Swiss-Prot record:
Main subcellular location: cytoplasm
GO cellular component annotations of the record: cytoplasm
Pfam families: SprT-like, Zn_ribbon_SprT
Catalytic residues as annotated in Swiss-Prot or TrEMBL: 70
Cofactor field: Zn(2+)
Protein name: Protein SprT
UniProt binding sites for Zn(2+): 69, 73
Family: Belongs to the SprT family.
InterPro entries: SprT-like_domain, SprT_Zn_ribbon, Uncharacterised_SprT
One function term, GO molecular function aspect: zinc ion binding
């Protein structure tokens, strides 16, 4: 997987170097990005992070558009400095003029939502209201934190039910 992506990063840099007649330091490339973002450029660290799941599901467009998009951020930063807008004129110039690509801000890849886990807690109100807790909040309860019902002021108690959505 990384070979094609690294080759595309290198190709984008060579195009920029040919156009601007100067060399640019190569970034570190990481595949440790999750969630909805396809890629992120860390300007001061000269680092590119890519989402491996979105790459696998959208390989052709990802290599063409997303890699160029993120490389353009680093090139624009190195050419014009830190005070430019992320998707401003300078970045758009690189996307259109060098890579011949539309300067799209966001991808349109289908992103699968991660399964969520909720732990049901209940109070002693007559209605027996359920309170779904996140795993983080459930862990805090296990460590001694208490949460209270706003109506009856009783401590919320874990019912033993776990919901997976």
């Amino acid at each position: 997987m990384p070979e094609h992506l690294n080759a595309r990063v290198e190709a984008c840099y060579r195009q920029a170097e040919h156009f601007f007649q100067r060399s640019f330091p190569r970034p570190t490339v990481s595949f440790r990005l999750r969630g909805q973002k396809a890629g992120v450029a860390h300007l001061d660290e000269n680092l590119l992070r890519f989402n491996p799941q979105l790459y696998r599901e959208n390989r052709e467009h990802f290599l063409e558009q997303t890699v160029a998009h993120e490389v353009a951020h680093l090139i624009a930063h190195q050419l014009f400095g830190p005070r430019i807008r992320p998707h401003g004129e300078e970045w758009q110039l690189i996307m259109r003029g060098i890579y011949g690509l539309p300067p799209d801000r966001c991808h349109t890849y289908a992103v699968k939502r991660r399964a969520t886990t909720r732990y049901l807690y209940r109070c002693h109100c007559p209605e027996h209201n359920d309170f779904p807790f996140s795993p983080q909040r459930h862990t805090l309860v296990a460590k001694g934190r208490r949460y209270y019902c706003r109506r009856c002021k009783a401590t919320l108690v874990f019912t033993g039910e776990v919901l997976r959505e």
